[in-house]
């Protein structure tokens, strides 16, 4: 009888411990996600701000003709040069693809590697990538994507030169730009590696980057967390196919 009582007590104690563990896990998980969401909302805002500042200088901005042809746009704000030198991830950013009537929720990516000879001495640099066709975008949705590998990459033209825009379109699937110390220009980023930050994508959306940016995934703005909407909304102000 006593052994039975002891056994029951042990079972009850174990059940109590498991209940407490589950309670703490239930509380900790939403808190962790809220922190991630806040960080990604800030990242989306920085990307949107950088893009806005670039486009607000028409004579030195991305040509409208190219912007309107882009299938997806990536912005990596405030990338630290030192991160590339030591081989670590240089920075984080967001990618949205064009969808009917606007742009998709931003998926989160890392950027690193490559040759950045023109940026020696720069503390922080904003990078903008235009994916000019679905083939280039599909390459991005792999686990790791190297610019200049399967998809050709070229320094994008700036300003109002339509002729330059047309010529570049014939040569590259991806156009790359950089802004450092207020100077915005095309920069060829061959060898740069971009990979999805799926820990953050899952924390914010519950799915990975390739699902977020899939052409078959139907999103509405109401399904997108409010904090990260600023990036697709900013892109829509400058380019929306009607």
Regions found by a protein language model. Give the residues of each.
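Bacterial N-terminal signal peptides
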Residues: 15-23
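Sec/Tat signal peptide C-region and signal peptidase I cleavage site
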Residues: 26-30
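Residue-level detector of alpha-helix boundary/anchor positions
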Residues: 1-4, 68
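Bacterial N-terminal signal peptides that target proteins for export
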Residues: 3-16
